[in-house]
């Protein structure tokens, strides 16, 4: 909960710990490994039209200096649709998370009034059963599916978690 407290104290609009940080944590725990690997990025997402790209980078650098034990990756989801082919701007952080490439990566957590809040738009079956498959958003577009397939090859997740089941459709 310490990392979630740090994120909550940033007081960023619509902010979450998300994506690979949580996916990898779950897979590590279920595989009997240390939950948060030292080399893991901490994927922090937020949504605020009033925070520029440069301000986001400055915030990331500040966090890196204050908490050097972690590799912070802070992304304002206002700008991130441009990294996904044929994708309209996201409406909020949840919209962005729901359109990540893999269903098991579409996961986010935060503290809301000091209570854990989880967002799993596709449920937890894929992540707890070590299944990697594209989200509906990626399935509906050939260019996005090419990005998805390139990610599968690049990430080489089965080397770390050999029991993963990878689906490319």
Enumerate the language-model features and the residues they cover.
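Catalytic cores of the polymerase beta-like nucleotidyltransferase superfamily
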Residues: 1-169
């Amino acid at each position: 909960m310490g990392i979630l407290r740090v994120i909550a104290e940033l007081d960023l609009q619509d902010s979450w710990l998300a994506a690979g940080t949580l996916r990898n944590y779950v897979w590590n725990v279920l595989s009997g490994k240390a939950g948060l690997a030292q080399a893991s990025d901490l994927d922090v997402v937020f949504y605020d039209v009033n925070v520029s790209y440069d301000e986001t980078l400055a915030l990331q650098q500040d966090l890196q200096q204050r908490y050097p034990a972690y590799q912070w990756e802070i992304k304002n989801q206002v700008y991130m649709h441009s990294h996904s082919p044929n994708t309209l701007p996201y409406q909020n952080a949840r919209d962005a998370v729901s359109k990540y490439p893999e269903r098991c990566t579409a996961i986010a957590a935060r503290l809301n009034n000091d209570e854990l809040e989880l967002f799993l738009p596709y449920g937890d079956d894929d992540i707890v059963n070590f299944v990697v498959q594209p989200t509906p958003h990626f399935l509906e577009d050939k260019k996005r599916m090419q990005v998805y397939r390139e990610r599968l090859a690049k990430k080489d997740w089965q080397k770390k978690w050999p029991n993963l089941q990878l689906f490319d459709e």
